[in-house]
Amino acid sequence: MNNNDKWARYCDLLYSDDSLGFWLDISRMDVAINDFEDFNEIYSKAFDALESLENGSIANIDEGRQVGHYWLRNPKVAPSPEISDSITKEIQDISKFGSSILNGEITNSDGEKYTDVFWIGIGGSGLGPLLIKESFKRESIGLDLHFLDNVDPEGISHKLNSILPNLNSTLFVVVSKSGGTPEPLIGMEQAMKFVRDNNQNWSSRAIAITSKGSKLDLLAHNENWLDIFDLPDWVGGRTSITGAVGLLPAALIGADINKFLNGASQMDALTRVKDIKNNPAALLSLAWFKSGNGKGLRDMVVLPYRDRLEVFSRYLQQLVMESLGKKFDRDENQVNQGIAVYGNKGSTDQHAYVQQLRDGIDNFFVNFIEILHDPLEIVEVKNKRPGDYLSGFLQGTRSALTEGGRQNLTITFKSFDESSLGALIALFERAVSLYAELINVNAYNQPGVEAGKKAATKIIKLQKEIEELLDDGKQRTLNEINDALSSDSTESIYLILRKLSENSDHYSMIGNQSNPDKLIISKT
């Protein structure tokens, strides 16, 4: 393709919106102009499905739930006055709470301002707030955020001890829709013990984000926690960032939450247009579909050329992979769908895996994210402007990939602020919703995650049974333990006991670890 043809194709496939300062270029993806006509019928159905979802239909059929994260940034589109009013009130309450913390109306027991937040949440309840922090921490006039998003004992110990110097001025936020998810529950229990062991009051500094009537909601009310914010059952964790899960950390670091919501709402409006060529989410989802032949045959590589978006690829991993990675479609056909997502940041990628992207296996497409405006405080030194080099690296990598026949698309924003982040998140949320309609999967459930939780619960139950069996002090082989417990996995018993023996002197495994079936197990 010569230069004139490339330019003509670029102009034909470019989408832009002046109000958001936004461009989407899919000209280097496997999309043809006639695809707009060929896909018109299936997209017409997808647009109608998304409209029905926003109108309050039970879109998550498996769980019998509405899907309402699009209402969060524009309460007026919610399907009932009750929902609309509750969203509006929540936004106002969070804004007021954030201001009260920042201006010192709410203080610790010594009358001092809070300086830190210890955030306990897993999955989207941790990734969303982390993205908020990383995106706006340079403009922050507020609190420093720390995250506990795992049950790694070493990680828990390190993170709790790291806040010890400022413990008296640290808020604790616990995020759990049900209040029973193991990771945030264990994190909360450890944090609670840590605070009390250091002679501090937990309830006066604890905040819950949870569903009304949940175990966490009841606990927070009974113990008179500092505040409680709502996580409705019609909002999933991976799409909760425009609710309390994202707004509270934004408010606590001094970001403009209304600007963030307005950006998302503006993008929602652009992506309600029922015309593929004039709908950026439709263009994006079509590019994904064509690239992977509708079967997710290509990975999505996310390369934002801006440090503040470094964790965006991790955020998209959950949004895209948990939403689209499904074994069965909605008609119960086995389809094994999904798109794998990974990424880095530019120009770090230049010195990491771009080598393989350019010359290795062709099983991906690249999603570049570009920000045009550079901060004024970084000036030219020795005739070099860092922003020019960053842009040059992006354009150069893009050209090198195209020359190698590698598909790529570019999302560009004029500047990066709360509005553009809200718009960027909304763009991908809407593209995921439309893509799910194209491949006929439920984007709002997570049966694989639930299966993992059930399996983990089974392992914990088995461990307790092993401990009780070995309380008699008798020596046994693994097979004898397995038979006594009528277990279906000797391997699981071995793995449990290997862990126990490493962490407790009461358990012993005598014998050669290379022959685990010969080991003699006992408890003293």
UniProtKB/Swiss-Prot annotation:
Catalytic activity, reaction form: alpha-D-glucose 6-phosphate = beta-D-fructose 6-phosphate
Pathway(s) of this molecule: Carbohydrate biosynthesis; gluconeogenesis; Carbohydrate degradation; glycolysis; D-glyceraldehyde 3-phosphate and glycerone phosphate from D-glucose: step 2/4
Enzyme Commission designation: 5.3.1.9
One CC-aspect GO term: cytosol
Name this protein carries in UniProt: Glucose-6-phosphate isomerase
Localization, UniProt: Cytoplasm
CDD domains with a match to the protein in the record: SIS_PGI_1 (cd05015), SIS_PGI_2 (cd05016)
Alphabetized HAMAP family for the sequence: G6P_isomerase
Primary localisation category: cytoplasm
Free-text function comment from the UniProt entry: Catalyzes the reversible isomerization of glucose-6-phosphate to fructose-6-phosphate.
Gene Ontology terms describing biological process: gluconeogenesis; glucose 6-phosphate metabolic process; glycolytic process
Gene that encodes the chain: pgi
Membership in a protein family: Belongs to the GPI family.
Keywords assigned by UniProt, alphabetized: Cytoplasm, Gluconeogenesis, Glycolysis, Isomerase
GO MF annotation, one: carbohydrate derivative binding
Superkingdom: Bacteria
Residues at the active site: E322 (proton donor), H351, K453
